[in-house]
Amino acid sequence: MVDQEKETTHFGFRTVAKEQKEGMVAEVFHSVAAKYDLMNDLMSFGVHRIWKRFTVDCSGVRRGQRVLDLAGGTGDLTAKFSRLVGEQGEVILADINESMLRMGREKLRDKGIVGNVSYVQANAEALPFPDNFFDCITISFGLRNVTEKEKALRSMFRVLKPGGRLLVLEFSKPLLEPLSKAYDAYSFHILPKIGELVAQDAESYRYLAESIRMHPDQETLKGMMADAGFENVTYSNLTGGIVALHRGFKF
């Protein structure tokens, strides 16, 4: 029984073999990549931009530093970090999904953001970078899709420089019960309909809603980061806890 538990994980509310989840998540993001930015604006009423700006403001990133935007998708954070680090710095936009990475590359190049940005297709559980390599790592709305989150957090810790910080921006648990009920109703009934109307894909957005519910809550994720080696781990609840920004340091 223990062995069986080790070999399975969740895909939304479903239990699947661990080796299957990566491919299933990949199909979701291949499907939604083309409409990803539009759907983000519609789903969050544009508030995701405020959450991301807060993340950048908390990053402490300075000119000349090296930043990893993990699960960076279409590059919203990468664009902001590119301006902060300047010509002497570097931002690596990494994503496991080829379609999302391609959309990010095309979007940033169309905006003229070139020169200090690199693109790497990478699995968060086994990052292909040297030890002590980055001044800052961010993962925005990506950790909940990772099969082995603890392994990914340890991998991030390894490639972070001493003195560096990790920022995890992710959906979390609303603080108030009325807000939680309203958010559930929106996520499970309205969100898939928006996905069907705009992206012709209700099923992928149903998975995204389920993946949010299965993601660890604020205190659990804080403990997971500490277990991975991060120190001074704190979090800020945003929009009533619908989203939380966790911060941890490597000393």
Swiss-Prot record:
GO terms for molecular function: 2-methoxy-6-polyprenyl-1,4-benzoquinol methyltransferase activity; demethylmenaquinone methyltransferase activity. Its EC number is 2.1.1.163, 2.1.1.201. The keyword Glycosyltransferase does not apply. It is an enzyme of class 2 (transferase). InterPro entries: SAM-dependent_MTases_sf, UbiE/COQ5_MeTrFase, UbiE/COQ5_MeTrFase_CS. Transmembrane segments: none annotated. GO terms for biological process: aerobic respiration; menaquinone biosynthetic process; methylation. Keywords: Menaquinone biosynthesis, Methyltransferase, S-adenosyl-L-methionine, Transferase, Ubiquinone biosynthesis. Pathway: Quinol/quinone metabolism; menaquinone biosynthesis; menaquinol from 1,4-dihydroxy-2-naphthoate: step 2/2; Cofactor biosynthesis; ubiquinone biosynthesis. Methyltransferase required for the conversion of demethylmenaquinol (DMKH2) to menaquinol (MKH2) and the conversion of 2-polyprenyl-6-methoxy-1,4-benzoquinol (DDMQH2) to 2-polyprenyl-3-methyl-6-methoxy-1,4-benzoquinol (DMQH2). Belongs to the class I-like SAM-binding methyltransferase superfamily. MenG/UbiE family. This is Ubiquinone/menaquinone biosynthesis C-methyltransferase UbiE. The gene is ubiE.
